[in-house]
A protein has these predicted regions:
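Mixed-charge, low-complexity intrinsically disordered regions
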Residues: 1-431
Length: 431
């Protein structure tokens, strides 16, 4: 451990890791570059936007039999959203990263340079990469910029620093190729995890998150639509991309104020069975409906509605309403063990391929944890098994897997205390 006084304000700054190259003074936000037993002030670092993450500097946990503590963070923003990378220090002196993106987590450690990879610009979602006998599938391809940071970090970053990264998955295995520096990417290897798996201590409590999320210190977010003035129901930093239900204007609230991303003509409100702000009790957790979007099958007439729910204790959940009924949908942290042209195996269960089709967003309202745009399209492949429907969704930059389980309309009625309204709407839709 290395302690010294901040050359800008005099406050104590601690380097807990011998490999940390920089630290951000928590009092004056000066970026301090370590040079031997001294530091150099490299200017101010932007303040991090407090978001929905329960993690903070000083959070501790266990991974692979080793205790760790969180000592730093960078926030990275891409065109359609942002995520956190937490720098963690293990009790044996080694270090790693805890990735935190919309409630999905992964721990990775540096395994050195990779010299057997395709160029960054040639990698596509679903592409394969083999390492140590395991074939990984590309899940995310991102060019992002650093917008803020805090604590200790192993290299110098600042506003404008650009990251080019590709994430790969296989089951719970997780691998990142970082093309940000040098002629060859660095390879980080680990696995997808839940906070419960890490046995985390000193997490932020839900009430604390609700008080601070979405606010820069000293600033509060505006909640009036910048285009028409209508009120937008927004849970700060839980979801930074907003669609006005009155005029359809798309706004970005990630910087603490509402900024118009795309103005749209005033359009009629879409009729939906559930409404923004509806509250439910599902699986012992309280949920609030924060966003909804209507989708249509590409080149066909089939339509459905997807509802995004948020819980302070459990994160995000989707409910999908279609002419076939209701489904509760969970985005998967652990991916299928095997995928072929006709079947998928996930957690020991076989799923048979049913259909492949395109989906296009035709309407969006409320708040989302990524940028949703009318016209967005993805390619979907459905697989049916005894535990539900397993689906892959592929866009130009991302591949995700989700598991949908059929839910009776009467159960949805009970969750939302709708007194038969959901069941009645489902009966009409099925006619």
């Amino acid at each position: 451990m290395f302690k010294l006084a901040c050359p800008s304000c005099g406050a104590e700054v601690v380097f807990r890791s011998a490999t940390s190259a920089m630290a951000v003074c928590e009092y004056c936000r000066s970026t301090l570059l370590r040079e031997g037993d001294a530091v150099r002030d490299a200017g101010k670092m932007a303040v991090v936007l407090e978001d929905y993450s329960p993690i903070r500097i000083t959070t501790s946990g266990m991974y692979a039999g080793k205790a760790f503590g969180v000592v730093g963070r960078i926030q990275l923003r891409y065109d359609d959203g942002f995520w956190n990378e937490w720098y963690i220090l293990f009790d044996d002196g080694s270090a790693g990263w805890l990735s935190d993106a919309s409630g999905q987590y992964a721990v990775t450690t540096d395994s050195g340079e990779a010299d057997d990879t395709p160029p960054f610009g040639q990698i596509v979602p679903g592409g394969q990469y083999a390492w140590e006998g395991v074939s990984y599938t590309a899940s995310d391809i991102r060019t992002a910029r650093c917008t803020a940071g805090e604590g200790e970090l192993p290299f110098q970053v600042g506003p404008g620093w650009e990251a080019r990264v590709v994430d790969y998955r296989q089951g719970v295995r997780f691998l990142t190729l970082d093309f940000s520096e040098g002629s060859r990417p660095r390879r980080y290897v680990g696995k997808a995890v839940g906070l419960g798996d890490l046995r985390c201590q000193l997490l932020r409590e839900p009430a604390e998150i609700a008080r601070s999320a979405g606010h820069l210190k000293g600033k509060a977010a505006a909640l009036a639509c910048p285009a028409c003035g209508a009120s937008i129901d927004w849970r700060p930093a839980v979801a930074a991309h907003l669609h006005c239900p009155a005029c359809g204007t798309e706004s970005d609230a990630s910087a603490g104020t509402l900024e118009v991303m795309e103005a749209r003509r005033r359009e009629a409100l879409a009729a939906t069975t559930l409404a923004l702000g509806d509250e439910a009790r599902i699986d012992g957790q309280d949920w609030t409906l924060i966003g909804l979007m209507k989708c249509r099958e590409t080149g066909a007439a089939d339509e459905w509605t997807e509802y995004l729910l948020y819980s302070e204790g459990a994160g995000f959940l989707w409910l999908v309403e279609s002419s076939a009924g209701w489904d509760k949908v969970r985005v998967l942290d652990a991916w299928p063990e095997s995928v072929s042209a006709s079947a998928v195996r996930y957690e020991g269960t076989a799923y048979t391929r049913m259909q492949a089709y395109g989906s296009q967003v035709t309407y969006a309202a409320g708040a989302f944890n990524w940028r949703v745009k009318v016209g967005d399209s993805v390619s979907i492949t459905d697989y049916r098994g005894s535990r539900g429907t397993l689906s892959s969704e592929r866009s130009p930059a991302e591949l995700t897997w989700s598991l949908a389980q059929r839910v009776p309309a009467a159960t949805v009625d009970g969750w939302f205390s709708k007194k038969g309204k959901v069941s009645a709407a489902s009966t009409v839709a099925a006619l």
